[in-house]
Amino acid sequence: MKLFILDYEKKRTKIGKGMARRELKMMNKKPDLYTIIVSYFSIFSLFFF
């Protein structure tokens, strides 16, 4: 999961590197369920943007 999220951050650098980093920081603090939800949301945002 974390590797995919990091790859997602690399793809999103043009749109907003700070946002991706903020999401990663939030994920480290929150429980695993939240991490999974945010990772799925990031996948969908990649497809729609």
UniProtKB/Swiss-Prot annotation:
Name of the protein described by the UniProt record: Uncharacterized protein YKL096C-B
Transmembrane segments: 31-48
Keyword tags: Membrane, Transmembrane, Transmembrane helix
Source organism (scientific name): Saccharomyces cerevisiae (strain ATCC 204508 / S288c) (Baker's yeast)
Membrane topology: Single-pass membrane protein
Location in the cell: Membrane
GO CC aspect terms: membrane
